[in-house]
Every structure is written in structure tokens, then in C-alpha cells.
From Swiss-Prot:
Protein name, per record: Frizzled and smoothened-like protein B
Cellular compartments annotated: Membrane
GO MF terms, alphabetically ordered: transmembrane signaling receptor activity
Bias (Basic and acidic residues): 599-609
Gene that this sequence comes from: fslB
Region described as Disordered: 578-642
Signal peptide: 1-26
Amino acid sequence: MFNKNNNNNKIIIILKLFLIILIVNNNNNIKTFGLNLPDGYGAGLVDPTATCSNYIGDSIDQPLCNEKLPNYKNIYTSKNITIQYINQKIVEKTFISLTFLQSKCFDLNFAEFGICDIYFPPCFQTPTTITPIKSVSLPQRLCKSACERMVSNCSSLGASLNCSDPLKFPRIATLYNLTDYGFTANGGFFPVPCSDPLATFENKSTTSELIEICPSPLLLFNSSDPKYSADRGYTYLTPTNCVLPCVAPIYTEKKWHQMYNMSKILSTISFVCSIYNVLTFGILNHRRSKYNYCITFFSASVIIITMMDIVTYGIGYEKLLCPEPGRFAVQSDVSCGATGALFHIGITNGVFWWTTMSICLFAVVKRIKLFDFRYFIIFNTTASLISVIIPLAGNAFMAGTGSLACWIRKTWYVNSVFWIPCGIALTIGSVCIILVIYEIYKITKNVSTKDNRMILLQIKPFLCVTLVGGSFYYLFIFNFDNESHSKEYKEKVVDYVMCLLSDTGKECLMAGPNYVAYFVFYFFIRLFGITFFCIYGTSQNARDIWIHSKILNHPNIKPFLLKYNIINFNSMTHYGSGTNPTSNSKNSKNNQNNQNNNSRKEFESKNIELEVNESISKGQTTRGADDEEESNINSASNTSSD
């Protein structure tokens, strides 16, 4: 995730922070007063308020220098104890910087020993035999040899550690002027040996490992522990053990909740609309046609898709997608595996049924007799089931770093069982639609401008396949555009880390897809049910189905509808699946049969099929066989169901 080869130059910028935190702040404006220092010696000022005290200790949840100090009971502390708290914060920020230098540096554990030595230096308390007037506390500076080892193992540190400066990194000792405290030997300058953490490092390195600290909101886990492996849903910023938070910081929290709310609202509406379409065209409608089957099966696919969303927001988006801090849901999380499988089988089946509808439209226009329609049902269902079984077997369903649902996140699987087969299906459907448009164009050239009924009949099917097909194509375009920029997004993770290290207080976001494009991607997926309802669920065809349904003609319901004039049953069309309110006499039944025969033809003219329903006057085109649509599906009787 963290591209070390392309981002090494950027990582060096982290050391700008290092420049600040590695200045030895307890050596304020050291001056030598014209003293000619011996080779290997530095000089320092005496702080009369400084003391030798215990190290304040690390916090329970964040280890720092407890195991990296030679003697935690003897730490040089200037002014008051609060300076230790300040230095502790600086050390913590320094360790954060070192965490992200692991790809460039070696022996960083020793560097951490050196950092602790700089900010919590060993303390030398002068005895009265040396300073009879007053005992003073003096710090032991880090030895030049230790500084050079830190720099040699991590060249990036050379920009911030000037090991040649004897005032900060003496080779032998630091001289302090103790004349005012009664020391007279050596011209009043007392040498305090430098501190070399090598001995401490060699003694404690086996028990004190490199301390990694991740800036908030990144979390620290042990990647070598199978419990926290990447396969369990942890996204590591290699080579560190820092993982991305869940939900991924691609967008602001406000924008994530906007997408959650959009998904809740549209999915619920789409679910209800699809239930209505299945009930209308699949259950109440006794007159079957291949287009009614297409509507029914496509709407059933949308129901499955939206069920995924309903289950997800029922559990809670963040609870389902992020079952633990820093961990994205994977297939072994039952709710993720189940919702992911629902979504995949729904979206795949939906693509296949959209393609089937396109093929049927083309077959009607070209008067091509298709094979038994049951083969479409068998193929679409079987292919959809196989496409979900394969990724389930490969544990390929997971939430991913930024999404609203669990789905297939392994590239090989998603390309093999979705993008490639569905891409082929969309291509076939698109070719059919283009050919249909061409056929309509040829027909309309011979149609009188005064008689445009045939053209109007084609608006709904074309509007449907265009909107739904366009939505599917947008999903493809967005996905492959996102994939083409995935490397760029990964490379820019270092910018996100730099923002976290800068500690400016502003909200840091990772690079990712454009928010509007991402929003529209999920918007279209949840719009299918509403689109089909608006085109077919509100049609005269759907109203006729309900008027003739047993539900509205039920003895307990029909009187209520008549009483309040909700539905005008006198104007309804009687066709095979309807209920006839006329008398039961033999003549009435014969009249009813004749009426139903005529009504069936009228109903066909309202049907959703793309066909020329009437002859055009004066040498115009003639209509193809009306009964082709029923050749593969059991047709309804011409008589009343009652």
C-alpha cells in the first residue's frame, strides 16, 4: 500500500519535522565566551534550577523510553518536571517519523535509544567536593560516535543531525564553567563525559524492539499475527504496522453519511417499486409474455440488490462494514458474505435480463422466431448462480477500503465472474438496441406524420433499455477509470501520511475517486427499481392488470372502491385474466368471450413489446405475426378466468 520506491524523496520531507524535534532544547544558546575548546570537547551552560530526577514514565497505552534509558531514576530535568512531559510529546512525534522511515533506514531501534538519550539525558550531580558552594545538576550529551552510527544507518537523518557540532554531540565530554559554585581546577571548567547508549542498547535490544507509533486516525496492529493479517480485513501501510481506519478517510464523515442516507432512501423506494412490478407483471397478470417475464425477473433482481442495502442499514453501515476498529468486513463475517452474495447475484442477473429484453425487442422488430424462452430463464439463472459460487469458494467477498457494501474485491475474481461476462452481455444488448433503432428509423420514414401512434408505442421500451443500459455502462466506465487510477491513489498515500505528521489540525484525506462520480455510481445501482416502476408500473397496461385482478375484485374490496369512486370498473378492459361483472346467461358469456377476444388484441397494442401494432394506410408497412410472443410461453386462455 505504501509505495516505498516512488515515495522515498517525499519521505525525506518528514525530516523537516525532525529538524525541529531534534534540536537539543535543553542547551539554550550555548556560548563558549571565546574559550578555545580542546578537540573532542563541547561546552554547556549551567542551569541552577535543573535537577536530577526520575523519568516520569511512559503512559500505559504508549511505550516510549522506559526500556531505552540507561537509568530511568537519574534523568536531567531543567526548570521543572513539566519539561519531561513536553519532551515526551516530542519523542512521540519523532518515533512516528521514524516509523515511516523503515523502508529507507536500518538500525532504527538504536536510533530510538539515541533519541531517548537526547531528550532524557543521564544526569550528573556534582558532589560538594567538586562544587563546595552548591551542588549542581549537569546533563550528559550524546556522544558523537552514537550520532554518527544513527546517521550512517539512516542517511536521511544526516539532514537533521549535525554530528560534527561538538556543542551538541561531543566526542569525549562537555565542559561546564563551575567557578561560581566553587570549582577552581582546570580554570573552573568541569568535564562531564558524553553518554553512549551502545551498552544500554546491547543489553536491552532483545527485550526492547523498535517502537512504531501511528498518527491518529491510523491504528497499530501486529501484521505478523494471523489474527491481524490483511486477509482478515486490515489494510497496512507497508512497511509499517499502521493500518487505515475504517471507514477509509477518502471523504469527509459528512459526505459518507450523505451517501448512507441516499442509499437508505433510494434502496427502500426501489425495493417497494420492484415488489409492485413483480406482483403486477408476475403474479396478478395471468396473460404471460416474454416481456412480462423480463420485467418480472429484472425487478426480482433489483429486489435482491436492494435487500442487500436494507439488511446493511438495518444492521448499520459502519457496524457491518467495519466490525472492529481498523478492520474491514470480509466474507468470514457472515453479514458481509451474505449481503455481498445477494448484491452480486442481483446485479449479475439484472444485466442478463436487460440483455434478454434487448434481444426480444430486436427479434420482434426483425420478425425472428427465438428458441424456447425457457432457455433464457435457465441460462440467466444458472449463470448468475455460478458467478456467485466461484467467488464464494475463493473468499473474495469483502467490504474494501471505501464502499457502501460488501462485494468481490479480488481483481481476478471480479473480472472473471462479473466484468467480463456482463461486459459481453451488455455489448450484445447494445448491438440489439442499435439495430432496433435502425429498424425504427427505416419504418418511420414511411409513417405519416399524422399517424405517430406506432412511434409513441416504442417510447417506453426504448426509454427503459436506454436508461438502464446507460446506467450499467456508467458502472463499467467508472470501475475501469477507478482501476486505472488505483496506482496513483496508492502513491498518494504518502501525502496523506505527511498531512498526518504535519499536525496542522486540518482534516487529512486520502486520494480517491471524485466524490460526485462515486455518489452517482451508487445512485444508479439503486435507481433501477424506480426506473422500471416509472416506465412500466404506471402504464395503462399495469392499471388494467390491477383492475382485472382478483384483489380489487374481491367481494370485500370492490364495493369499497365503487362506493368512493376510486376505480371506474365500468370503463375497464376485459381480457383473459379479468373478472366480468355481467350476468351469467349463456348469451352474456358468448358476448364476453367475443369481447375478450377483441380486448386481447387491444391489450396487445398496449403491451410493452416493440412491434408495429397497426397497418399504416396507403402502402405503409404491415404488422408481423402478433402471436410470436406467445410461442415460447404458455399463453393465457382467451376466455375469462371466471
